[in-house]
Amino acid sequence: MRRHLIALTAAVTLAVAAVSSACTGDEAAVSRDGANATVVRVVDGDTVQVDIDGQREKLRLIGIDTPETVKPDTPVQCYGPEASAFTKQLLPEGTAVRIERDVEARDDYGRLLGYVYRADDGLFVNLEIVAQGYAALLTFPPNVAHVDEFVAAARAAERANLGLWSACSG
């Protein structure tokens, strides 16, 4: 009887471990080598919903911060609607993209973290949003693979008074 109970406990433990690892999906959604995806919708200027192999995921663009438009208990911020519209222009519904990871797969809210490139022309979307003045630099180490590019783009946009650097500076 005791052996049967030990075997049953071991089987249940293994089953729970298998289900738990299958449900986390942190590594599976976007491997270190990246993943192809399709844009389902733009949530706001720095968050999009994507389809990766039939699975819908919210994806937070690494390295950038656009003014808020949909954050609960937060008023719409200066240049937020414009930033969201610009991201929608860059990533219309159905756009094929390539997502690259950095060190961390997800943020504290469970969203995937990634660098997004349009499949048709290779445009680095995160960088373009900063370069055109629709986002400020936002870095959370250890996710810093492109920080130098983002710093240069943000400085250039600010010097040129592009986007939020012009509209929200007063």
List the model feature ranges, each with a label.
Residues 2-170:
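Small beta-barrel nucleic-acid-binding modules, primarily SNase/OB-fold domains
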